[in-house]
């Protein structure tokens, strides 16, 4: 998923423009070549100087053995994380957005879950497709321009994790999900025991994607996603792993859809040069920033989350500055 792009940025800074070109070369139409940054809507403000915002999405789009999208498949943005690459502090900040957040989607009006934007853009063949509409929707929510996006498939996630030999994670509580969405439009049971363990690509995907058994539901899943991202980043960027990076890049290239040009990707990678590990700070639109729907809202929209716009605005300000989230909680740095 989105992990692949973020992990790829740092070595690109070391190895240079040819490597960035390799990552972003066109393959099976999954990369948007030379599309450049998206035009921002009138109400969104630019990010602070030295900060580049990228909307990272994990897509459940499936491909056959020839790399073509499975006929009749409708892609969804199963994961949405807003990334802020701070070129001055050499750090990356990540803000998770819950998939059931009730928002207004440009051109479609209010009353939609935020993850519907990607699907609407894809199925209606809008300019820029699902990524562009998802970006405009998030810009409208947070009030900040997001010029770039990156979408990575679940297949890419599995292959990327396997390419580095798996990732060690301390699973805090066992994951038992009897309704996990499988690859063939079915629901399958999955289980990940508690404790420190090596997760391969398949089990890693279970860990970051399952939410039905988590008492915090999507909020708990968002925390697990950021933990996994941090652990994978640390493993990929170890000096002894440099020899495996070519294989990792091939996977990124084949499973990435982005409007970042090679030069732009190089610039983001260069932002991390000089630090042995990327400093990653975690933020989230958590349960304290939303409320449950009223009975009328539930009847209209189902089990959605109603955003507290004032509280989210405060979180976004802290996120862009790199300050602790409002309320005294501290971002979770990695590699500090």
PLM regions: where:
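Non-catalytic, solvent-exposed segments at the cell envelope interface
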Residues: 1-336
């Amino acid at each position: 998923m989105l992990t692949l792009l973020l992990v790829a940025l740092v070595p690109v800074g070391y190895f240079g423009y040819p490597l960035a070109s390799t990552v972003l070369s066109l393959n099976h139409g999954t990369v948007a070549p030379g599309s450049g940054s998206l035009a921002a809507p009138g109400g969104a403000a630019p990010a602070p100087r030295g900060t580049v915002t990228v909307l990272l999405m994990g897509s459940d789009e499936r491909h056959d053995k020839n790399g073509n999208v499975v006929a009749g498949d409708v892609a969804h943005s199963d994961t949405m994380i807003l990334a802020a690459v701070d070129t001055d502090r050499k750090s990356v900040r990540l803000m998770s957005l819950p998939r059931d957040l009730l928002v207004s989607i440009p051109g479609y009006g209010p009353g939609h879950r935020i993850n519907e934007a990607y699907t609407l853009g894809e199925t209606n063949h809008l300019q820029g497709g699902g990524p562009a509409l998802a970006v405009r929707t998030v810009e409208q929510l947070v009030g900040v321009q997001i010029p770039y996006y990156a979408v990575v498939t679940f297949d890419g996630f599995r292959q990327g994790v396997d390419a580095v030999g798996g990732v060690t994670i301390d699973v805090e509580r066992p994951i038992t999900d009897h309704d996990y969405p499988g690859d063939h439009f079915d629901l399958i049971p999955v289980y990940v025991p508690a404790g420190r363990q090596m997760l391969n690509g398949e089990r890693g995907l279970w860990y970051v994607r399952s939410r039905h058994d988590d008492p915090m539901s999507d909020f708990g899943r968002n925390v697990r996603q950021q933990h996994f991202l941090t652990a994978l980043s640390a493993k990929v960027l170890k000096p002894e792993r440099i020899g495996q990076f070519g294989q990792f890049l091939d996977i990124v290239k084949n499973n990435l859809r982005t409007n970042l040009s090679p030069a732009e990707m190089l610039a983001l990678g260069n932002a991390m040069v000089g630090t042995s590990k990327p400093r990653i700070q975690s933020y989230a639109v958590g349960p304290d920033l939303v409320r449950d729907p009223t009975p009328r809202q539930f009847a209209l929209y189902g089990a959605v989350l109603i955003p507290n716009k004032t509280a989210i605005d405060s979180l976004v300000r802290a996120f862009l500055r790199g300050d602790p989230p409002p309320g005294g909680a501290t971002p979770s740095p990695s590699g500090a």
